[in-house]
Amino acid sequence: MLKEFKEFALKGNVLDLAIAVVMGAAFNKIVTSLVQYIIMPLIGKLFGSVNFAEDWSFWGIKYGLFIQSIIDFIIIAFALFIFVKIANTVMKKEEKEEEVEENTVLLTEIRDLLKK
């Protein structure tokens, strides 16, 4: 049973997923700090409020924090979109290379059959 678990845990997909989760958490911290400490203070200065996230509230509802979370989400979603686009481009190139090899093999077999 331990051997089966080890084989499962060391499969490429499981390791890739584990690495992606760790990297995603780290990336989330980077984007959150970028939004919280750089972008939101600049937006706060534009609107005349020193702390946009905390000062923009109405009846205890902190709209500034909500807007900060939206900006955070947009940055992460855009970064993931770019990553997926790049990954898809790389995968398509690999598929085209495989097609060429498969076609070459088939043509070689046809040629050999025609020689007989």
UniProtKB/Swiss-Prot annotation:
Record Pfam families: MscL (PF01741)
Question: One GO molecular function term?
Answer: mechanosensitive monoatomic ion channel activity
Primary location = membrane
Which GO terms of the cellular component aspect does the record hold?
A: plasma membrane
Membrane topology, as annotated? Multi-pass membrane protein
Q: Which InterPro entries match?
A: Mechanosensitive_channel_CS, MS_channel, MSC/AndL, MscL_channel
Keyword terms, alphabetized: Cell membrane, Ion channel, Ion transport, Membrane, Transmembrane, Transmembrane helix, Transport
Superkingdom of this protein's organism: Bacteria
Task: State where the protein is found.
Answer: Cell membrane
Question: Where does the sequence pass through the membrane?
Answer: 7-27, 64-84
Q: Which family does it belong to?
A: Belongs to the MscL family.
Q: Subunit comment for this entry? A: Homopentamer.
Q: Kindly provide the name given to this protein in its UniProt entry.
A: Large-conductance mechanosensitive channel
Name the encoding gene, please.
Answer: mscL
